[in-house]
């Protein structure tokens, strides 16, 4: 145990929710991790404390100028009762990249991993064992200086909270989703903050997501901000197309989030001898490939669902049914392989899991 991390014992333990009705982000565990930052002092007072509301000044910078970044990863319960984390080091590195872009102080990556591990270990009983469930881990940093001046805050709070979550697919069966291609609103611009996991990016996506939902679609496929034709990402996922037996995914251009599941999928697909092209691809190319019968699969990758097959794309009322509208072979193999690694059923070729 890192003795630098203090612990305060709770006097009240919550009743654990019914694992069959967890949903996403509705329940929270007994403890949270907290650490503070002041300019001239640095990060200090790391502690695990009872989960509780925060007290913040109404003029705290986070409320006015959006200095807020976060991460999302999961802890999984194996069949033999162990608890595994999936590539937590990559999430922590990405958190620091987000901090840098938002002019926020970097975190000690070893300390963050230790804090995360200690917190999950303390809350092991909250990691559900039912199929498709997991313990969602949300690290985040917010600006706390009480000031209305437009400048980087001089104080911050870093926290980690935990939430038991159910299967993204409800019954844990892969289901193809319907995607609306958005060419009015944009998610990010070159030179902006698209590669950072910052709160404002998600706020900016909500109106388009609402529009897509009202039209009967599940997710939004974002295009580039300049020409509005080059594919970027889908909602909270990166996107892949299988064209002529090759996997094609948009290159990381600075306006696309560098997904941990995306990177894992690329490594696995290549290890299976299937070519992966990371390049600019327009929505017109996707539709043309479909017309030629060469587009056999589309899928998204992300922490929430791991792999999400896409059965339909729509832009300006023009619909493309992907493959036969069902789950493709590569989507299924990827989902099964990554989830088997996360659940400790197979070790996998890359040593991606960390036991708590």
From Swiss-Prot:
Domain of life (superkingdom): Bacteria
Alphabetical UniProt keywords: Amino-acid biosynthesis, Aminotransferase, Branched-chain amino acid biosynthesis, Pyridoxal phosphate, Transferase
Residues with PTM N6-(pyridoxal phosphate)lysine: 197
Catalytic activity: L-leucine + 2-oxoglutarate = 4-methyl-2-oxopentanoate + L-glutamate; L-isoleucine + 2-oxoglutarate = (S)-3-methyl-2-oxopentanoate + L-glutamate; L-valine + 2-oxoglutarate = 3-methyl-2-oxobutanoate + L-glutamate
One of the GO biological process terms: isoleucine biosynthetic process
E.C. code: 2.6.1.42
Pathway where this protein functions: Amino-acid biosynthesis; L-isoleucine biosynthesis; L-isoleucine from 2-oxobutanoate: step 4/4; Amino-acid biosynthesis; L-leucine biosynthesis; L-leucine from 3-methyl-2-oxobutanoate: step 4/4; Amino-acid biosynthesis; L-valine biosynthesis; L-valine from pyruvate: step 4/4
SUPFAM superfamilies: D-aminoacid aminotransferase-like PLP-dependent enzymes
Any Pfam family: Aminotran_4
Regulation: Inhibited by canaline.
Cofactor(s) named in the record: pyridoxal 5'-phosphate
GO molecular function: L-isoleucine-2-oxoglutarate transaminase activity; L-leucine-2-oxoglutarate transaminase activity; L-valine-2-oxoglutarate transaminase activity
Similarity field: Belongs to the class-IV pyridoxal-phosphate-dependent aminotransferase family.
Role: Transaminates branched-chain amino acids and ketoglutarate. Involved in the final step of the methionine regeneration pathway, where ketomethiobutyrate (KMTB) is converted to methionine via a transamination. The amino donor preference is isoleucine, leucine, valine, phenylalanine, and tyrosine.
Protein name from the UniProt record: Branched-chain-amino-acid transaminase 1
Native organism: Bacillus subtilis (strain 168)
